[in-house]
């Protein structure tokens, strides 16, 4: 049985940082969670807490496909959002693979709001750096992450905290939970129904195949 431990928002950051400090060299961290769980905020706080260890946050939505591709079936096709919006090949090519090989990372490819390519400058990171990729529905894709964190919301909390204009993603998030089982894939699960009083559930069994 997985041990669940109550903590604080600062305690969540400390737990993630401890996982990273246990690994030498360059580390690729993913913080996965529905937008309502705000994985980007946790990613930013982890980057700040890692200092002076170099770290860079990459938002997964800055690696979405162009609108002409991802919106082929409409603006609110939840299955396309789950399976097709993320440009996995670009994320591998510009971030995950070169970071390990050379330390070079392109922090963003496209502005998810304007759909325009961004003029990001390639960043050269040292051998002990951490790249933090934050976003939704990122696990179970076979992407090469070294440390995995999933921020979990119960179905009730997810419905309550998801803005009305994003409610069309709820069926996809349900399918993601059922089919990809992100909790079983994560090194650390953050139970965040109460953002002031979260809980931690470290993994106690080997993860399923990617």
What is each residue range found by the language model?
Residues 1-23, 146-147, 151, 156, ...:
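NTP-dependent small-molecule kinase module
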Residues 24-29, 128:
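Pre-Walker A (Motif I) flank of P-loop NTPase domains
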Residues 29, 56-58, 132, 147-149, ...:
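Hydrophobic/aromatic beta-strand patches that form the interior of the parallel beta-sheet core
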Residues 30-48:
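Glycine-rich phosphate-binding P-loop
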Residues 47-57:
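Post-Walker A helix-loop "phosphate-sensing" segment adjacent to the P-loop in P-loop NTPases
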Residues 59, 64-115:
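Conserved nucleotide-sensing/catalytic segment adjacent to the nucleotide-binding pocket
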Residues 115-162:
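ATP-dependent NMP and nucleoside kinases share a basic, alpha-helical "lid"
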Residues 157-173:
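Flexible active-site lid/hinge loop adjacent to a nucleotide/diphosphate
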């Amino acid at each position: 049985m997985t041990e669940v431990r109550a903590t604080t928002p600062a305690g969540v950051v400390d737990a993630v940082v401890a996982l990273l400090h246990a690994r030498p060299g360059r580390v690729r961290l993913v913080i996965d969670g529905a937008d309502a769980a705000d994985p980007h905020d946790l990613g930013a706080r982890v980057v700040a807490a890692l200092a002076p260890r170099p770290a860079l946050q990459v938002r997964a939505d800055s690696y979405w496909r162009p609108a002409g591709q991802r919106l082929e079936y409409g603006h609110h096709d939840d299955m396309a959002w789950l399976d097709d919006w993320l440009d996995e090949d670009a994320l591998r090519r510009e971030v995950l693979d070169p970071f390990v090989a050379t330390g070079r990372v392109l922090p963003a490819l496209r502005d998810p709001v304007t759909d325009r390519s961004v003029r990001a400058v390639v960043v050269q990171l040292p051998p002990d750096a951490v790249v933090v990729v934050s976003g939704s529905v990122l696990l179970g894709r076979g992407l090469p992450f070294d440390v995995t964190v999933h921020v979990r919301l119960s179905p009730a909390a997810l419905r309550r905290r998801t803005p009305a204009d994003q409610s069309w993603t709820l069926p996809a998030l349900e399918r993601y939970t059922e089919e990809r089982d992100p909790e079983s894939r994560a090194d650390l699960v953050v139970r965040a129904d109460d953002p002031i009083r979260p809980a931690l559930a470290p993994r106690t069994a080997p993860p399923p195949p990617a």
